[in-house]
Amino acid sequence: MNPPGTFHITATDGSARTGVLYTAHGIVNTPIFMPVGTVGSVKAIAPDDLEAISAEIILGNTYHLYLRPGDELIARRGGLHVFNAWEKPILTDSGGFQIFSLSSLRKLHKDGVIFRSHIDGSKHVFTPERVITIQRNLNSDIMMVLDECVAANADYTYTAQSLDLTIHWAKRSRDVYPKGEGDNLLFGIVQGGMFKSLRHSSVSQLIDLDFDGYAIGGLSVGEPKEIMMELLYDTAPLLPKTKPRYLMGVGTPLDILKGIEAGVDMFDCVLPTRNARNGTLYTSQGKLNIKRKEYAEDDLPLDENCSCYTCQTFSRAYLRHLFHSQELLAFRLNSIHNLTYFLNIIFGARKAIHGGYFFNYKQQVEQLYCN
């Protein structure tokens, strides 16, 4: 077994690549989609369900787990893997995005951020060092540094000041957790808003800190899709080829494939589970809204090309009935299917990269979602 942080590229097709990332709780094959388990669980999904659909890594959120039930409580239980019975790798976001989304409930300063809990209004302080301590208590395999995610309409002056702060925090994070300190990996986060020059500066300064991997943050925050993709394709090639690259909070199946095309390895998004709970399901024929009346007597599975438990067991008519009856089982079955679809998109991408036909594979998916 290679030491945590080892990353091997196994195949390339243009900038798209497959690889293997080693962590303390096992390997992660890339590209990979990470189901979001904000408070330690993927909504409506049990660990056995995740195993069954071949999920390799999930995401948790430092902010939410710190507030409830508390990182020290989780540490006393043996860490997040023991607490939530998920034995495979876990990545924890620093909570920066959630804190900065609080706007009126937080105050920024050089040392960190003061914020009030969205739960009970209690006052808390996150410093770069504190965020690392919390994540080490959680014992996540991949930790993220504290950063500020600016709004899409932030001007150059504010964005430049914000980037200086984010880099300052990244340096302090690296100081408190030097390379080789432990088995937890630490990723830096590229920021810089909508400005290429600032993102280039961010990449350069983060590379000097020699993180175990690099995330592209601050995209899909309200900017037009064309600008998001332009910044993605501009930023990703600047990151070290020998380290994993993570596009935070993005996105649709097509967004993910475009990210892979740009050379990104890791993705997370709440979209598959959130849409599942709203009745929107992804299939090999495009999106399907199970709430529609046309499915009331439809005995077909959601997707005849899908091997997930939901599709192999239940009809569209039954799933529609569950949804309209407000049965909680609908959330689980729909989520199993949507997560399976997203992971199958990833598995197909890996196969296409190895086979040298990734561009054609991406075009096939594009036809489903651009009509």
From Swiss-Prot:
Keywords: Glycosyltransferase, Metal-binding, Queuosine biosynthesis, Transferase, tRNA processing, Zinc
GO BP, one annotated term: tRNA wobble guanine modification
Catalytic site positions: D93 (proton acceptor), D268 (nucleophile)
Matches recorded under SUPFAM superfamilies: tRNA-guanine transglycosylase
DNA-binding as UniProt keyword: no
Location of the region described as RNA binding in the Swiss-Prot/TrEMBL record: 249-255, 273-277
Binding site for substrate: D93, S94, G95, G96, F97, D147, Q191, G218
Segments forming a coiled coil: none
GO CC terms, sorted: cytosol
NCBIfam families found in the cross-reference section: Q_tRNA_tgt (TIGR00430), tgt_general (TIGR00449)
The protein's role, per its UniProt record: Catalyzes the base-exchange of a guanine (G) residue with the queuine precursor 7-aminomethyl-7-deazaguanine (PreQ1) at position 34 (anticodon wobble position) in tRNAs with GU(N) anticodons (tRNA-Asp, -Asn, -His and -Tyr). Catalysis occurs through a double-displacement mechanism. The nucleophile active site attacks the C1' of nucleotide 34 to detach the guanine base from the RNA, forming a covalent enzyme-RNA intermediate. The proton acceptor active site deprotonates the incoming PreQ1, allowing a nucleophilic attack on the C1' of the ribose to form the product.
Protein name from the UniProt record: Queuine tRNA-ribosyltransferase
Lineage: Bacteria, Pseudomonadati, Thermodesulfobacteriota, Desulfovibrionia, Desulfovibrionales
Gene: tgt
